[in-house]
């Protein structure tokens, strides 16, 4: 039997690795589009600044062809290079297009009419057509310029430093558009605005040279539609990663933005590794996870086998990215998302409520994270030389903070299908409920819950762990998640315990919600509760022995 299991594990791993071809193999050749890329061999800042504006206008032009836009993008990203002729050769590696370099000496004064070099293969009609395209901006571009400020294009640029500041300000906006061009291009631009603000604060982006939002959108669309451009940008990202600490401004900027681009489309895979395998908690030993753990092992080996380009699978449209989809390991993905939703507040921005998300294993992750937050890693504690008293102090500190965090309903179940704003209601929602005094005998053997300032708080069990069993449920989905775990609570939705009385070997609990009051009896030491009486709230009011009256109408 063990040989069969080893063979299955080896088969699963080889299944992920065997369908890859050798690195550098040439794919079957298909039809290629001819792309003209304009090259300037002079370091003249005025000419290069004119080429920068010319490329922006070609990208935004409403009558340009796809090849015109691709050539303008490659020329735009190559402008900081001292030798554009050699730098553009990076694009020659693409099997998608035939790159044709056209050397340009400059522009006619006051126009965007090209002055070609004698070696450039450009006809007079093509030169006139490019000049018309540069002036043919769509009506969605205001003031006849891609920039927010209308006078930016006409400003003189006679110093290399001026050109580099303007060029880097434009290119950094184009690179920010690359971040979401393949994974979330249709999402609101809040993340892009935050990155623009970051680079303005760092001095890498001058606000005066900001492009109009429509121009930024057209650049992003052009990058998204062109595999040639994205392959070229991937080579640039790899060059930036290889740079040392002493690097030029451009590749330092590209390396910084590359951190937002790396592993895009693989978020679910890396979050699963972080919160499922990284925590090393006991639920990983469940038999249901055995096959999926083997799957994760094979995916980690595949990622290493792909090499440096594995970080840019989404940017390259590589088919291997489908192997990392969380639908291939749904149970352990659900468990990891439950753990992450408790440990990491940034998980609120990640959409993990997929159709294959298993609510039961998600809740296992939630409960495990809540109960294990105060545990101490013995290996790390030994390395730090912590005494048993110090370890207990750390555990008690975390438990105390977890109980008193006060984010709405303490210890309430996390529901992946409800927005976080609805889940984390402030404690003030119970301000209209007076604090009911509990009897002296309010500590249940089974982990009851008490009141503090009118809000129910989880009880502390032996070992410093927090008991979340007697918590109110907020919606049917949450009740469904908790029902197989705690049926004695889930059968009374939206309830609050308002009285717990122990007398004569019996323990009585009184619950109420908006329509009824329910009385449950349980013999001390028993595990089940018996329904004693249900009273409509609208016709009943009662007085407690403490002297506090509560009208339930």
Swiss-Prot record:
What are the boundaries of the region Ntail? Answer: 405-553
Location in the cell: Virion; Host cytoplasm
Which Gene Ontology molecular function entries are recorded, alphabetically?
Answer: RNA binding; structural molecule activity
Record field: transmembrane = none
Query: Which region ranges are annotated with the description P protein-binding?
Result: 1-398
Q: Gene Ontology terms, cellular component aspect?
A: helical viral capsid; host cell cytoplasm; ribonucleoprotein complex; viral nucleocapsid
* Primary subcellular site in the record, as a coarse category: virion
The record's Pfam families line, in alphabetical order, gives: Paramyxo_ncap (PF00973)
The UniProt keywords, alphabetically, are: Capsid protein, Helical capsid protein, Host cytoplasm, Phosphoprotein, Ribonucleoprotein, RNA-binding, Viral nucleoprotein, Virion
Q: Any idea which positions bind RNA?
A: 180, 195, 260, 350, 354
Keyword Phosphoprotein among record annotations:
yes
Establish whether keyword Transferase is in the entry: no
Phosphoserine PTM positions: 439
| Known function | Forms the helical nucleocapsid (NC) with 12.71 N subunits per helical turn and a rise of 5.3 Angstrom per N subunit, protecting the genome from nucleases. The encapsidated genomic RNA serves as template for transcription and replication; encapsidation by N is coupled to RNA synthesis. Forms the encapsidation complex with the phosphoprotein protein P. Before encapsidation, the newly synthesized free N protein, so-called N0, is chaperoned by P.
Q: Into which family does the record put it?
A: Belongs to the paramyxoviruses nucleocapsid family.
Its quaternary structure?
Homomultimer; forms the nucleocapsid. Binds to the viral genomic RNA. N0 interacts with the phosphoprotein (via N-terminus); this interaction allows P to chaperon N0 to avoid N polymerization before encapsidation. Interacts (via N-terminus) as N-RNA template with the phosphoprotein (via C-terminus); this interaction positions the polymerase on the template.
This chain's protein is named Nucleoprotein
